[in-house]
């Protein structure tokens, strides 16, 4: 199994074919539906955010899990996806986490069917 690098152009296609590979990524991966509900939350993201992945499935990412991501840049990109079903953007972000700002790089990429999008999260 080849290593999939962060920011890979075809990462969404690989995970659409082989969804179990999300668990083996060396960075966080969160799959959201068009309403922001978490469909998948990999172990790496669980480690980054100190959360049990099973506990966040079915919750709204922006309202229940990461309200600090509801800022203009992060949530604005997601709202574009919500409206169009398409997104492929990479940006730096600082999560307010336990009283500290944690720097991350976000790659938000829609699935080919336009019904869900991945948030790939890498600490910087």
Swiss-Prot record:
<feature type="domain" description="PAS">
    <location>
        <begin position="22"/>
        <end position="85"/>
    </location>
</feature>
<feature type="modified residue" description="S-(4-hydroxycinnamyl)cysteine">
    <location>
        <position position="68"/>
    </location>
</feature>
<keyword id="KW-0157">Chromophore</keyword>
<dbReference type="InterPro" id="IPR013767">
    <property type="entry name" value="PAS_fold"/>
</dbReference>
<keyword id="KW-0675">Receptor</keyword>
<dbReference type="GO" id="GO:0009881">
    <property type="term" value="F:photoreceptor activity"/>
</dbReference>
<protein>
    <recommendedName>
        <fullName>Photoactive yellow protein</fullName>
    </recommendedName>
</protein>
<dbReference type="InterPro" id="IPR012130">
    <property type="entry name" value="PYP"/>
</dbReference>
<dbReference type="InterPro" id="IPR000014">
    <property type="entry name" value="PAS"/>
</dbReference>
<dbReference type="InterPro" id="IPR035965">
    <property type="entry name" value="PAS-like_dom_sf"/>
</dbReference>
<keyword id="KW-0600">Photoreceptor protein</keyword>
<dbReference type="Pfam" id="PF00989">
    <property type="entry name" value="PAS"/>
</dbReference>
<keyword id="KW-0716">Sensory transduction</keyword>
<comment type="function">
    <text>This photoactive protein is a photoreceptor with kinetics similar to that of rhodopsin.</text>
</comment>
<dbReference type="GO" id="GO:0006355">
    <property type="term" value="P:regulation of DNA-templated transcription"/>
</dbReference>
<dbReference type="GO" id="GO:0007602">
    <property type="term" value="P:phototransduction"/>
</dbReference>
<comment type="similarity">
    <text>Belongs to the photoactive yellow protein family.</text>
</comment>
């Amino acid at each position: 199994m080849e290593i999939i690098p962060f920011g890979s152009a075809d990462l969404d296609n690989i995970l659409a074919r082989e969804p179990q590979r999300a668990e083996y990524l060396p960075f966080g991966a969160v799959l959201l539906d068009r309403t922001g509900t978490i469909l998948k939350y990999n172990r790496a993201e669980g480690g980054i955010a100190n959360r049990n992945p099973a506990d966040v499935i079915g919750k709204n990412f922006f309202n229940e899990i990461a309200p600090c991501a509801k800022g203009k840049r992060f949530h604005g990109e997601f709202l574009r996806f919500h409206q169009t079903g398409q997104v492929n953007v990479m940006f730096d972000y600082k999560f307010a986490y336990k009283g500290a700002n944690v720097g991350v790089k976000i790659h938000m990429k829609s699935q080919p069917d336009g019904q869900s999008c991945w948030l790939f999260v890498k600490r910087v």
